[in-house]
C-alpha cells in the first residue's frame, strides 16, 4: 500500500484519510498514518476532540465530525459521528483550495491546511488535534483569494 500511496502523491494527488475511531490507545491506522496522507481527526461543535479518535504524531489536522447530520435512504436524516466525516470536511476544503490554485502540490496543500489551522489542545502541533482545526476561509485567503471571494466560497448554501 505504501508504494501505491507514494505513487499517487508523486502524481499530484492529495491523499486524505480518517485517523480512525478506535480510541487513544489504538496504534496508528493506515492509510492515515502514511507520510503521504493527510490524517484527519474529528471534533465536536465545541472544538473538543471526539473521544474515540485515534491519536498520534501522524494526525495532521482536525475538522467537525461529531453529530453530523446525514441523509438516509428515503427522505429521512440521522446523526452520525466519526473521523470519516471530518475527513470529508477536509476533502471539501482541499477541493476549494485546488479550485483556486490547481498548480499546488500535495505537500503545498498540506502546508496551507496546517499553517491556517487554529490551534486546539496543547500549544502547537500535538497528537490529539495535529495542527488544529482547519479553516477554509483562512486557507483560501492564504493562497491569494480576496476575502470576499473566500467568504463566498466557504459560506453555507442558503
Model-derived features: positions:
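Structural recognition of the beta-strand scaffold that forms the well-ordered cores
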Residues: 14-18, 38-41, 60-63, 69-70
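A generic "binding-loop/recognition-motif" signal
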Residues: 45, 57, 64
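Residues that line or immediately flank small-molecule/substrate-binding pockets and catalytic motifs
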Residues: 41-44, 116
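Substrate-binding/active-site groove segments that recognize
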Residues: 59-60, 135
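Hydrolase catalytic cores
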Residues: 13, 51, 65-146
Amino acid at each position: 500500500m505504501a508504494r501505491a500511496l507514494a505513487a499517487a502523491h508523486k502524481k499530484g494527488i492529495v491523499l486524505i484519510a480518517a485517523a480512525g475511531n478506535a480510541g487513544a490507545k489504538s496504534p496508528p491506522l493506515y492509510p492515515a498514518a502514511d507520510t503521504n496522507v493527510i490524517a484527519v481527526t474529528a471534533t465536536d461543535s465545541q472544538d473538543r476532540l471526539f473521544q474515540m479518535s485515534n491519536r498520534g504524531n501522524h494526525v495532521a489536522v482536525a475538522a467537525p465530525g461529531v453529530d453530523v447530520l446525514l441523509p438516509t435512504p428515503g427522505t429521512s436524516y440521522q446523526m452520525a459521528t466519526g473521523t470519516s466525516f471530518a475527513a470529508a470536511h477536509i476533502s471539501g476544503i482541499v477541493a476549494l483550495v485546488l479550485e483556486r490554485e490547481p498548480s499546488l502540490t500535495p505537500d503545498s496543500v498540506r502546508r496551507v491546511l496546517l499553517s491556517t489551522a487554529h490551534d486546539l489542545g496543547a500549544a502547537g502541533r500535538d497528537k490529539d488535534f495535529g495542527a488544529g482545526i482547519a479553516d477554509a476561509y483562512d486557507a483560501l485567503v492564504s493562497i491569494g483569494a480576496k476575502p470576499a471571494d473566500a467568504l463566498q466560497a466557504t459560506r453555507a448554501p442558503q
